[in-house]
A protein has these predicted regions:
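Conserved, well-structured beta-alpha core segment at the onset of a catalytic domain
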Residues: 1-102, 354-366, 370-385
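Non-catalytic, alpha-helical, charged scaffold/linker segments
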Residues: 47-209
Length: 385
């Protein structure tokens, strides 16, 4: 089952983009693929990168408020970036970052938080895959033991060791403690270090600037796409990049593995809808998952090439039809994500699902694929659960 991941706005090539891709691919292989009856190494993943054709700012967004302050960051190296993501994870959330206290309140949620923190620093797909396998063991243990006795006497120094020990002791298979335990301890360290920063004015300022930048680039990427998407005979660069990946994924189908699934984040959903309704309606999808997307909003504004002002004739009671080439369509949103929208009120044959990323409104839009539990839920939906 080839999977095509279509990224959204505000993605530009660099270390953070490549680390996010590696982490995402690792969790898709180790959590989603087995649920679909595939061996992890057999899963073909296509990730068309269209960000290079997105908006460019002549003055580097100098029009944003307080440009003289510069764009503060948590640091230029990878670990500082990972810590910044964890600060965003904790800011305005119910978690405190004090892992033992959090575990005593909600052990399964704390396990997910710990692995999200570890995943934030994954540097390769292999490391992400190891984390994903370990997460599945620990998540299963947490589901069966939501209030384990050992948490009452655990300390921040031994929490990761005890979690790793009890999770593996409950399974016949062990994935090895060495590298995983180190990654978990790094994740726990990020939580401890991020906890004080998550409540400071500096964190709020940084996250607001991040949101401001995201919204600005969202508008810019959207305007560029709409102005340059091209025609069916001469598609623009963004459409062509995604279309080529879809056709390559179609060609990768075999008689024994003939399914094709597309995961589209944010504006990737709008690109996919234009492709499926205008540029190439012949592309057959067994599953389409739009995440934090605005597909319904853009149809309400009638901005697609296939949009018709008189269809449906009786909104809001009426709906438009799901593209016939899509067998199943799941639309995932977080009420904290200010850039995510429902789709059921506009399109027939679509299932809306709410997912709580655990992030505040300042960071939720990019948070879905940072949470290990998101892949677990996705696997369950795709496998019919």
């Amino acid at each position: 089952m080839p999977i095509v991941f279509v990224h959204g706005v505000n993605n530009r090539d660099g270390e953070a983009y490549r680390e996010n891709e590696a982490g995402r691919n690792g969790f898709l292989r180790e959590i989603v693929a087995p649920a679909l009856g595939l061996k992890p190494d057999k899963l073909r993943i296509f990730s068309p990168y269209w960000g290079k054709f997105g908006v460019e700012f002549a003055w580097n967004m100098a029009v944003l408020p307080n440009p003289g302050d510069g764009f503060e960051s948590f640091g230029g190296n990878a670990e500082s970036e990972a810590l910044g993501r964890v600060v965003g994870l904790l800011a305005e959330s119910q978690a405190t970052g004090h892992v033992v206290v959090d575990a005593q309140q909600d052990f399964p949620a704390t396990v997910d938080l710990l692995y999200a923190s570890a995943m934030a620093g994954a540097k390769s797909e292999d490391e992400a895959r190891d984390l994903a396998r370990s997460y599945m063991l620990c998540a299963e243990y947490a589901d069966k033991n939501p209030q384990p006795d050992w948490v009452a006497t655990a300390t921040p120094d031994n929490f990761a060791d005890q979690l790793n020990y009890v999770a593996e002791a409950s399974q016949e298979e062990s994935f090895g403690a060495g590298g995983i335990l180190d990654s978990l301890k790094e994740g726990l360290s990020r939580l401890v270090n991020a906890a004080p920063d998550a409540t400071t004015a500096l964190a709020g300022s940084l996250l607001r600037k991040k949101l401001n930048t995201t919204v600005t680039r969202f508008a810019g990427d959207a305007f560029v796409y709409l102005a340059r998407r091209g025609t069916k005979d001469a598609p623009g660069a963004i459409v062509k990049t995604v279309l080529d990946a879809l056709r390559n994924a179609q060609a990768a189908r075999t008689a024994d593995d003939d399914k094709l699934v597309v995961i589209a984040h944010s504006f990737g959903g709008e690109i996919m809808y234009d492709i499926l309704t205008h540029f190439d309606p012949t592309i057959q999808l067994d599953g389409l998952i739009t995440v934090g997307s605005q597909v319904g909003l853009f149809e309400e504004m009638k901005l697609y090439l296939a949009s018709r002002p008189n269809l449906p004739p009786d909104p809001p009671a009426g709906h438009i039809a799901r593209p016939p080439s899509v067998a199943r369509w799941f639309n995932v949103f977080d009420t904290n994500d200010v850039l995510s929208y429902r789709l059921e009120p506009v399109v027939n044959g679509v299932s809306d699902f709410h997912y709580d990323t655990g992030f505040s409104s300042l960071s939720a839009h990019g948070g879905y694929f940072m949470r290990p539990s998101f892949y677990k839920r996705m696997a369950a939906r795709l496998s019919g659960g």
